[in-house]
Amino acid sequence: MALIAVGKSVCFLCNEVITEDTDYGGFPHFVPNKNDELFAFSDSPVHIDCVNAAPNGAKANRYADEFIKFTRPENRKCLVTGELITKYEDHIVIGYLTSDEASPLHRFNFRHIHRNNLARWADQVLLLSLLLALKESEDWKHHYGQLHLSNLINSITI
């Protein structure tokens, strides 16, 4: 979640300081791709009114809420079997990939897979090919370069 210092933090939407007399909040760091339209919201302090007035404010709220729900332990259910994944070493996490609902990657946002079920997952090859294409494109920019995508690709490769 964004760290907010009242009287010092600045809302990125209006460039005004966040004060005690305004409703404010912060987004979690939910968007890893700097080229995504919602990246500016990720890990940012904001005025609530500014988010509500922003053209993509509702969309940012929706994806941030989905991210928070996704990270809860009780929601870590394998997309192949529906069973809860309880051990970290068995857990493959596919987080936020894109806000572009027309992208074939969109349907893979916020998914959990038990490592033992990877070979049974019908969409494994499709996701792998999409991630490899994304890695080679200019559409993905991460502060750790391609490491984030490389780690995800490695985790879903048998």
What are these regions (language model features)?
Residues 45-56:
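Cys/His-coordinated zinc-finger cores
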Residues 9, 42-44, 99, 103, ...:
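Generic serine detector
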Residues 9-39, 48, 79-119:
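Short recognition patches in nucleic-acid-associated and regulatory proteins
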Residues 6, 24-25, 57-58:
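A short linear-motif detector with a strong N-terminal bias
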Residues 1-8, 37-40, 61-75:
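Short, flexible, mixed-charge glycine/proline-rich loop motifs
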Residues 116-158:
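C-terminal, charged low-complexity interaction regions
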Residues 54-85, 124-140:
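Polybasic, low-complexity binding patches
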Residues 2-4, 16, 44, 92, ...:
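Residue-level marker of intrinsically disordered, low-complexity segments enriched
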